[in-house]
From Swiss-Prot:
Disulfide bonds: none annotated. This is Uperin-2.1. It comes from the Eukaryota. Its main location: secreted. Expressed by the skin dorsal glands. Keywords: Amphibian defense peptide, Antibiotic, Antimicrobial, Secreted. One of its GO terms (cellular component) is extracellular region. Shows a medium antibacterial activity against L.mesenteriodes, M.luteus and S.uberis. It is found in: Secreted. One of its GO terms (biological process) is defense response to bacterium. Pfam families: Antimicrobial20.
Length: 19
């Protein structure tokens, strides 16, 4: 759903910032 997609996007952004 939209919530799962949003969580995936946020997770990707946080992972990118963590590098």
């Amino acid at each position: 759903g939209i919530v799962d997609f949003a969580k995936k996007v946020v997770g990707g952004i946080r992972n990118a910032l963590g590098i």
